[in-house]
Amino acid sequence: MNTNKVAIFGKKGSIAKYDLTDNKPIWVGELPKGQMPHVIAQYENYILVFSWAWFGSKMVHCFREDSGDSLWSHYQQTLHSSMIPFLPHTFENHMYYLASSKEVAKLSWETGDIVFRKRFKKSIFNEYGLGIISNDVILLSKKDALIVNKETGDVKPYPELSKKLNLKEITAALGNGISFMSLISLTHPQEGDGGAGATAAGGGDGGS
C-alpha cells in the first residue's frame, strides 16, 4: 500500500497531483490560458475544477484522478446559471442538477456531453431542490413534488410523494448519488475571496 502523502493543488493555468513525500508531481493538468482554479473537488475517479480568469469567463473542467487526463471543459453559463449553485447528484455515471430555478439538466461525467438542459413550468413563488430517491430523479418544493424522465428531461407531477410526506415541514433531504459534491454550493466565488481554504485535497492514495 502506498503511504506517500499525496494532494492535488492548483495554480494559474494548471492543476497538479503532487507527491509530497517524494517531492515531485505525479501528473500536471493544463487549464485554458488565464484560467485560475478556485475550487477543486473529487467524485470517484473524476476531479472537478472550477476556475475563473480576471475580467473573463468562469469555467468548469473535469480530469481523471488517476492519470490527470483532461476529459472536458465547459463555460459556466453552458452548464448552469450563475444565479444558482451547482449541486450535482450522480446516477449511473451522469450528473443531474438544476441548471437554473426552472431548468433541470443531465451531464455525462465521462464525456461532458449535456444530455439535456430542459425548462419546466413552475410558479414564481415555488422553489425546487433536486434529489435522487432510489432510481428516481425528483424535484421537491414546499408545495409539491415532480419526477424527471432521466432520458428526456420531461417533468411531471409526483403526487405519491406528497401523500407520504408533509412537504411544508421538510427543510433538508439526503438522497442517493450526492457524496460530498452536494457541499459545493459556492462554485465560483468572487475574485477577491480567499483561495487556499477552497481547495479539497486527497490523501494517501489520492483520496480514492
List where the protein language model places each region.
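Secretory-pathway ectodomains
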Residues: 1-208
